[in-house]
Amino acid sequence: MAKVEQVLSLEPQHELKFRGPFTDVVTTNLKLGNPTDRNVCFKVKTTAPRRYCVRPNSGIIDAGASINVSVMLQPFDYDPNEKSKHKFMVQSMFAPADTSDMEAAWKEAKPEDLMDSKLRCVFELPAENDKPHDVEINKIISTTASKTETPVVSKALSSALDDTEVKKVMEECKRLQSEVQRLREENKQLKEEDGLRMRKPVLSNSPAPAPATPGKEEGLSTRLLALVVLFFIVGVIIGKIAL
């Protein structure tokens, strides 16, 4: 007896294509349409039930309606040299009057009432040009971030360590500048006093005015020289820190 032709329409009709990589679950959809004026029962079977999850794997499609079936391939180690021998079969029959117990209805169905369509599984790896660049982009960003972040952190740490020393040196410089300014004013005042003494009329009965105390002037000169040397040392320290 001739086999009854499948009344359901299948999209795709002959192949279920699964596109890798296969390190995660890969899902493809199978659309079942019922162009008839009667409700149709269906079930989806596979030769490798442990490798696939099918949702829904059975049901009833109303007249003129359609349903999408998700076929999920579980992760596995893909071998391009190994051809897939997995197959799916969509089996169908017109729904009986009583659909309360579909398991019994399938068991009681006559072979001539059953219709089926077979599809083979095809595994595909994405082409080089079609591969997503997210992984590469993330890798580049990560590498760039690592390269730029390390010097910044090191520089910040170095700056934090140097800031204390620089601050101390700057405070010392300010103190020395104030001291130099004070000495300059004191030296200027002494010179003015010395000039005033020189301009005063010399009285015959009065002893000649004594010039500015040499010891004091020598002390000022010595202190100025010491400050100059100290400034030089501070400059060298700042130069080393800056480097």
Swiss-Prot record:
Q: How does it sit in the membrane?
A: Single-pass type IV membrane protein
- The scientific name of the source species is Sus scrofa (Pig)
List the Pfam families. Motile_Sperm
Q: Which InterPro entries match?
A: Ig-like_fold, MSP_dom, PapD-like_sf, VAP
Q: Which residues cross the membrane?
A: 219-239
Family recorded in the similarity comment: Belongs to the VAMP-associated protein (VAP) (TC 9.B.17) family.
Record flagged with keyword Endoplasmic reticulum: yes
Phosphothreonine PTM positions: 150
Q: What does the entry's free-text domain comment contain?
A: The MSP domain binds the FFAT motif of many proteins.
Q: How does it assemble?
A: Homodimer, and heterodimer with VAPA. Interacts with VAMP1 and VAMP2. Interacts (via MSP domain) with ZFYVE27. Interacts with RMDN3. Interacts with KIF5A in a ZFYVE27-dependent manner. Interacts (via MSP domain) with STARD3 (via phospho-FFAT motif). Interacts with STARD3NL (via FFAT motif). Interacts with CERT1. Interacts with PLEKHA3 and SACM1L to form a ternary complex. Interacts with VPS13A (via FFAT motif).
Indicate what this protein is called per its UniProt record. Answer: Vesicle-associated membrane protein-associated protein B
Q: List where in the cell it is found.
A: Endoplasmic reticulum membrane
**PANTHER family in alphabetical order:** VESICLE-ASSOCIATED MEMBRANE PROTEIN-ASSOCIATED PROTEIN, VESICLE-ASSOCIATED MEMBRANE PROTEIN-ASSOCIATED PROTEIN B_C
